């Protein structure tokens, strides 16, 4: 997440970024985490997104994120004012990976996991027994 879209666009035009992002077209395995606004009071979430951005995500009913790409409980992508400042793999490229693996393990991640499953952003889920039991209810 960059300070403004101009920085993001400049980086995206660089040859170094183009070389790296070309690999995204041929991913075999993607191993990434799932974020959740339910953990917004946590130090990491607050440090990364801040209070104002967190409030905006809640207002837009964001269920979770993968690589700062936000989605709702139904799996639909949610555009935010951070979208144009985000420099990360696009969700459609993650969905093309042969194995798209997520390893979330807490009740706080429930809405993010459900949204990711419904959006088909996951084809392999590794979690603990308590989170799995919650998902099966």
Stretch-by-stretch model annotation:
Residues 1-137:
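Conserved phosphate- and dinucleotide-binding cores of soluble alpha/beta proteins
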């Amino acid at each position: 997440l960059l300070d403004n879209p101009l920085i993001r666009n400049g980086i995206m035009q660089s040859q170094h970024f183009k070389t790296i992002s070309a690999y995204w077209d041929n991913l075999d395995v993607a191993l990434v985490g799932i974020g959740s606004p339910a953990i917004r009071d946590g130090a990491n979430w607050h440090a990364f997104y801040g209070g104002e951005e967190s409030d905006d995500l809640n207002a837009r009913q964001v269920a979770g994120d993968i690589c700062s790409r936000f989605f709702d409980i139904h799996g639909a992508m949610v555009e935010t004012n951070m979208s144009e400042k985000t420099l990360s793999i696009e969700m459609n490229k993650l969905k093309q990976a042969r194995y798209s693996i997520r390893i979330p393990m807490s009740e706080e991640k429930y809405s993010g996991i459900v949204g990711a499953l419904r959006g088909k952003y996951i084809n392999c889920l590794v979690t603990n027994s308590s989170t799995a039991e919650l998902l099966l209810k």
